[in-house]
């Protein structure tokens, strides 16, 4: 069983944390993030670190212990370095471009797909076939990238579609005569 919760979360220079009840607020150079923990754990600020301890020995308390510690670590990472997902578009005529707060995708449909970018996330297109999603909220960055990818998932025969930069597409052989 993992004991990731035992390890305290260090606060780098330029990052401050404040705890009020079960809510942790982390401020850093990229912004401010908050997280509300369950009553199964206790959160304390000790000597430049955030320490999470379980209340009791129940299974739920032990589960929340590691999860809350990981969430606090993600808050610190988000306000210092941020999170980034890169997508690649593969296919003839498939391309993307930003127009204000809308990502326009040409994906082989009879119409262009207009994807509204939510607040808290920055989407850029360095090339017509590359999309970069950045932000301080790991869950939101991942969800936006997944929503963009969902418009045209990579297919296994030619590999056409939108995929993550490091994703491997298992290729299938076509029919034989």
From Swiss-Prot:
The species this protein was found in: Cereibacter sphaeroides (strain ATCC 17025 / ATH 2.4.3) (Rhodobacter sphaeroides)
GO molecular function: rRNA binding; structural constituent of ribosome
Keyword Transmembrane helix: no
Cystine connections: none
Cited HAMAP family: Ribosomal_uL6_B
Subunit structure: Part of the 50S ribosomal subunit.
GO biological process entries: cytoplasmic translation
UniProt similarity note: Belongs to the universal ribosomal protein uL6 family.
Function noted in UniProt: This protein binds to the 23S rRNA, and is important in its secondary structure. It is located near the subunit interface in the base of the L7/L12 stalk, and near the tRNA binding site of the peptidyltransferase center.
Domain of life: Bacteria
UniProt name for this protein: Large ribosomal subunit protein uL6
InterPro entries given in the database record: Ribosomal_uL6-like, Ribosomal_uL6-like_a/b-dom_sf, Ribosomal_uL6_a/b-dom, Ribosomal_uL6_bac-type, Ribosomal_uL6_CS
Statement: the UniProt record of this protein carries the keyword Ion transport: no
Keywords: Ribonucleoprotein, Ribosomal protein, RNA-binding, rRNA-binding
A GO CC term assigned to this protein in UniProt: cytosolic large ribosomal subunit
């Amino acid at each position: 069983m993992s004991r990731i919760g035992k390890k305290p979360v260090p606060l780098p220079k330029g990052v401050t944390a404040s705890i009020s009840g079960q809510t942790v607020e982390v401020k850093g150079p990229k912004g401010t993030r908050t997280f509300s923990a369950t009553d199964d754990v206790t959160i304390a600020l000790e000597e430049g670190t955030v320490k999470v301890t379980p209340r009791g020995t129940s299974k739920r308390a032990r589960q929340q212990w590691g999860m809350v510690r990981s969430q606090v670590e993600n808050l610190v990472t988000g306000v210092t370095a941020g999170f980034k997902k890169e997508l690649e578009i593969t296919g003839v005529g498939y391309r993307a471009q930003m127009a204000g707060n809308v990502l326009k995708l040409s994906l082989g449909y009879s119409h262009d797909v207009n994807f509204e970018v939510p607040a808290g996330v920055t989407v850029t297109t360095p090339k017509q076939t590359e999309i970069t999603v950045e932000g301080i909220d790991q869950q939101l960055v991942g969800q936006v990238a997944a929503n963009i990818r969902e418009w045209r998932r990579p297919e296994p025969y030619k590999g056409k579609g939108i995929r993550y930069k490091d994703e491997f597409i298992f290729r299938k052989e076509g029919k034989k005569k």
